[in-house]
A protein has these predicted regions:
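Residues at the starts of beta-strands that form the adenosine-phosphate
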Residues: 9, 32-34, 118, 145, ...
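N-terminal Rossmann-like NAD(P) cofactor-binding module of classical short-chain dehydrogenase/reductase
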Residues: 66-67, 92
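A conserved regulatory-domain signal marking ACT and ACT-like small-molecule sensing domains
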Residues: 283-367
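NAD(P)+-binding Rossmann beta1-loop-alpha1 motif at the extreme N-terminus of oxidoreductases
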Residues: 1-58, 65
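Internal alpha-helical scaffold of NAD(P)-dependent oxidoreductase catalytic cores
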Residues: 39, 140-226
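Rossmann-like NAD(P)(H) cofactor-binding subdomain of soluble oxidoreductases
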Residues: 78-134
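Interdomain hinge/lid region at the active-site interface
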Residues: 208-281, 298-300
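Short beta->alpha hinge that forms the Motif I/post-I loop of the SAM-binding pocket
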Residues: 38, 70, 94-96
Length: 367
């Protein structure tokens, strides 16, 4: 089997956001997909969306690949069942933790070593704050990392199949062992979720008048706090050992910050605050840029637009006709006014040109 060309049929067990998105993407690639979920409602929604057909237990269906897209608590058991039910199929899972799953499978006396060889863990680094099949998108994984996590007994055929799924879904393939993967996602995914949730929880008793002043800074840092608590309880529990040292490091920094703020004008306090902020600057600068490229600084052009249909589309059309590429875009609505502020990021060398073009077209550019 060539990499990037998956042979069906495929069975997707778990028709939530990830499972249904994978099914939609594979169906778009012309692959036959069967669906199975403990929730009849979730199954029906996925079928109605065109993700595949129902493939309940006992049907005459022999998939070459089974994708397990279920919460971490039940994933090992469902993998074991799939390995037993489909003895010729490769089985992969999409859970965001890997070490606890492979450990549970190895400890399961009912899972033979030969069967376990057909299993490979996968973790698509894509998602949304919304959950469930109705939030699924066939292009969800496009250009996102697809982490393949084989264990020492995984066959080369199983690993190649796991890679092919990601490639057929438009993802970028990365291979890691379970420990490296779990440490990485603890830092870049699970810890940010905790930080966002803790920050958002501070807003529970905040006066409405204070929240009315909120801008994109607060919205950006609390966006993922809207994620499903039921799923995250499981994720955090399964990756607790990797999270503890990160949280202990944060605790140390918070203790240091509190000590400084208790006497902010003492000798050395300003330097300590500057060091904390600078460390944050340096860490943020290490985050890769677009398409995995090295970090790059962009210039920002701010434009006031009326809160009317088509305004942003017209703005971007004017940019395109001028031959200026937009690197990123943010929009902030003005409280109490029917206008918004669009912040467009462009290459620094194109900033003045863009300001001139937009001003000439009567856009309200904030200088």
């Amino acid at each position: 089997m060539a990499e990037g060309y998956l042979q069906g049929p495929v069975l997707v067990i778990g028709t939530g956001l990830l499972g249904t998105s994978a099914a939609l993407g594979l169906r778009a690639a012309g692959i036959e997909v069967g669906l199975r979920d403990a929730s009849p409602t979730a199954q029906r929604i996925a079928v109605d969306m065109g993700a595949g057909f129902l493939a309940p237990h006992g049907t005459d269906f022999a998939p070459s690949l089974v994708i397990v897209a279920t919460p971490p608590d039940v994933t090992p058991g469902i993998i074991a069942q799939a390995l037993a039910e489909f003895p010729d199929a490769v089985v992969i899972d999409l859970a965001s933790v890997k070490g606890s799953i492979i450990d549970a499978l190895k400890a399961d006396d009912d899972v033979a070593e030969a069967d376990l060889a057909r299993y490979v863990g996968c973790h698509p680094m894509a998602g949304r704050e919304k959950s469930g099949p109705a939030a699924a998108r066939g292009a969800l994984f496009t250009a996102s990392p697809w982490v393949v996590v084989p264990h020492e007994g995984s066959t080369s055929h199983a690993v190649k199949t796991a890679k092919s799924v990601g490639l057929d879904l438009g993802a970028s393939i990365t291979v890691m062992d379970a420990e490296t993967h779990d440490a990485a996602v603890a830092l870049i995914s699970h810890f940010p979720q905790i930080a966002s949730s803790l920050l958002a929880s501070r807003l529970l008793n905040a006066p409405a008048s204070s929240l009315a002043l909120a801008g994109n800074g607060l919205r950006d840092t609390t966006r993922i706090a809207a994620s499903d608590p039921r799923l995250w309880i499981q994720i955090l529990a399964h990756n607790a050992q990797q999270l503890i040292p990160i949280l202990e490091g944060l605790q140390s920094d918070l203790d240091r910050l509190l000590a400084t703020l208790r006497d902010p004008f003492a000798s050395g306090a300003a330097l300590d605050l500057a060091e904390l902020m600078t460390e944050g600057n340096q860490g943020q600068a290490r985050i890769p840029g677009k398409h995995g490229a090295p970090p790059q600084s962009f210039a920002t052009v701010s434009v006031i637009v009326n809160d009317e249909p088509g305004q942003v589309a017209r703005l971007l059309t004017d940019m395109g006709e001028a031959g200026i590429n937009m690197e990123d875009l943010r929009m902030e609505h003005s409280s109490g006014y029917e206008v918004g502020l669009v912040e467009i990021q462009v290459l620094p060398g194109r900033r003045d040109e863009l300001v001139s073009v937009l001003t000439g077209l009567d856009w309200k550019v904030v200088q």
